[in-house]
Amino acid sequence: MTLRIAIGGFLHESHSFAPCPTTYADFVQPGGFPGLCRGSAMLPAVRGCANAVAGAIAVAEAAGAALVPLAWCIANPAGPVEDAAFERIAALICAELSAALEAGPLDGVYLDLHGAALIVGAIPVTASLDPHANLTLQMVEESDALAPYLTYPHVDMKDAGARAMRLLLDRVARGVPFAKAFRQGAFWIPITSQCTLVDPMAAVMTERAAILARTGAAELAWCFAFPYADFPGCGPALAAYAGTQEAADAAADALLATVHSREGDFQLDVVPAAEAVAAAIREAGPGGPTVI
């Protein structure tokens, strides 16, 4: 049987304190990324990009699934998305989804998101996330599995899309949902302390992999969060997915304990801007150039 899977995406990293709101036009012409695309134009537009959706497409097609494109868009980080823009894009995706359902039953839905979820009833839903997503209990409850990127700077977006698609194919094959466990962190992590190339985050990511291997969990979604998105659910959080509730709880508790044990290490001493500029000029010397 050929699986019929809907695929789409809606990505934005919103800074609550940035002065310029994000408009619909910013999604149509984002600069550096494919512009808003829908229906038959979507797959050709995003297939060769570095975003998670491209990795999901590759895995689905390798598995012989029939992909039903909805819509996909991204805008560069800026102020909150204008209500009119959000509603317009959400309505567009929902319209494409409704048309897909009218054409025949869907076996699953994959979404390329930054940090939001879409409710699609009883149809299995997985999504890839930016780890700066402010993961909430509602997002976990209203999806089957979430797969954040594992790197910051983000160099594994396509891999995350592939992981999310594999989770969707596994969920469809299982016929029953994964057991889930959600945990919220007790403190915020500054962006400057989130780089996965160095400790403490590098050590946390290494332990995440070890916990997955030890518990046999299907996925351990760890989101560092984006502390500049000012809303009640803001903050680091994680979700574990496994074949049993015991395994999901064990994986989630272990990673949360690892993060909490490193709380002091996430506090970085930063240099005020004026001091940083002066130090850079001194370091560069009279011949320059000065690079900051």
Residue ranges of predicted features:
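Hard-cation-handling environments
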Residues: 3-5, 192-292
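Low-complexity, highly charged intrinsically disordered N-terminal segments
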Residues: 53, 57-98
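N-terminal amphipathic/basic leader segments beginning at the initiator methionine
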Residues: 2-62
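Conserved anion/nucleotide-ligand pocket segment
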Residues: 161, 165, 169-213
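Alpha-helical scaffold segments in soluble metabolic enzymes
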Residues: 55-59, 92, 138, 163-170, ...
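Hydrophobic alpha/beta core scaffold segments
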Residues: 2, 65-68, 108-116, 120-127, ...
